[in-house]
Swiss-Prot record:
Pfam families: PH_6. InterPro entries: Meu6 (IPR039712), Meu6_PH_dom (IPR039483), PH-like_dom_sf (IPR011993), PH_domain (IPR001849). CDD domains: PH (cd00821). This is Meiotic expression up-regulated protein 6. Residues 194-261 form the PH domain. Residues 1-12, 21-30, 90-102 have a biased composition (Basic and acidic residues).
Amino acid sequence: MSYEGREERPEQIAEPTFENVSEHNEHDSGSAEAQVETLEVPLSNETDNDDATENAVPAEVQAPEEPKEPETVDNIDPADDDPNSVAAPKVEEKKSKKKAKDEKPLTYTTGGYLYCRSNGLIPHVMKRYFYMLEGPMSMDLLDHYYKKHFHGTLQGNPTEPSLASEQMHDSDADSLFQSANDHLNRIAKATQDCRGLLFYSKSQSTSVPSGIINLTDAVSIEPGTGNKFTINFNNGKSETLEALDPESKNTWITDLKNAIAKKKETKDKIKELRAYNDTLKRLGKLAARSGPSASETFRYFLPMLSNGRDAKKSSSKSHGGKQNNSVAKDGLFDFFQNMIKGKTPQNDTASPIDNETSADPVDTTVEAQSVEVPENETNQIPTTEEHFPATTEEVAPASEEKPATGPAEESTSTQNVEQASTQNDNGTPIGQIADAIEEDVKGTAQSVEQAFIEETDIALPDIALPDVATPTADDQDPSTAATNEESVVSNEDRTSKKAGKKHHRHHKKKKGGNKRVFGFKLHKYAKPTKSVKTLQADPSLEFAKAGFEIFPSNLSKKLSGLVQKKVHKKFDKDGRLKEISQFSKTTIKPETPLTPTTTPTPRTAAQEDPAEETTDALASAEGENNQMPQVLETEAAPSIASEGRSITVNA
């Protein structure tokens, strides 16, 4: 392994490890030379003359291989007496000359860094050094590529295959080549000639390839967006590469197109080589004995996890029964990509049963529509031209009067339309969605009906009702009061429900925020206040004030203030009565309280009542002490005002 630059790399010389295999032609002469070398060594070690004469036969074997020049006295060297110093250098020189004739140096035609997609367990984009070579490559350099896909190494190859591998038939070997054909075929081609192969390694400083792309199986080169370009293969797969700049992209495209144009010549030339076929068979037997690597087995079975169990069958059927090794790579990449994005893998091919079940509901809906539409049209459209104008005139007012009975019909029509749309879009009737749609349609129908009723309410004219004395709470029977309260509460509930529907229809939120019940958000609306009838003014207070006008101003103010305080305690903050005051026993209209309109007239002695005594007492108390009486009968004032009597006050 060299760590020099691409331009300064030493020429890699092919050194196959199958050196002692007799089937290689280039190793036959080498084996003969090894035999000669072994024979020459004992000759040099023997010093006895008797042994030298007995072993004259091996000396004859050496004579025909290299004819010796006639020895003369001038040519003899005293140092040549020792045969060890002469025999070894000659054999090494012969080996080096033969290797120099047979070997072809590796030449780099193109090279540069490209971005590619990894074919490992974790998919990612990586930067690798790509290059193309001419000439054979050593097995030692291809050992790393072999380890990635198979167990064992190429360096420790046995000289002779085991008995089990020898007994294996050629048909079994061929079936094995179909499964691991691509990797072994690339290694066997690289040992003979690197033309038609695209290598890539981790960096420019290493000559050990980590991956090989077979350009003889490529079909075309397509330029992509940016600096990308794609290599399309016979099996339908593709390899996308990205250059660093547009110039390098153009050079790579031209070089790869030239290599693909010569693929037929290189393929025919390599297949004719006997060494290529022998190497491929030995690699197949070695791979069968060692087995695939763990990562390769994982890639082989991973498409069943990512694309389903039918992915492997479909890929093998589409390519004539042969397995496509690139399916595992793409399936692995898609599997991790879907796992990162949170998606579930979906099969491209659907079973025929699923197709049949999905097709049946669509056909039924189409047939129903095709049957129903003509019937409706035949019922509506007139058959003759004479009745045509009459029907058009009669249809128009019907369409205008339709909203009076429309909400129920509209709800049913919208429901049918929505159900039909769900069936046509999805292809299958969905019961749950239909139930939800029915509930929504019912809610909208109720809201439409409510709005329609509110809009069509007739405003009644204001009619003056006769003056009727309203009975107080004390005068009413308990049974009648209870029924009245229930009727008021029921009316208030109806009004509150209407108000709640209006708020729900307009989506107006009130105070109090929202609540969640089992995950559903519920709008919290303020409860409507109960409508309680309130009196604008207490009639008893007005009559009391009217009765106090007969007194002096100072006393009348004090009396009215006292009464007002007593009544004010019975009112709420909102002006509502807590209890009905004692002055409300009089049967008088609440809207227009009576005021004293009659002027006081002098009375006779016959018309005097006991009530005058109280007024006289009050007047005398005011005149003497100017103080407020402790006891006052308030019922006397309204009675006096109602009867219209005149009161005289003695000075």
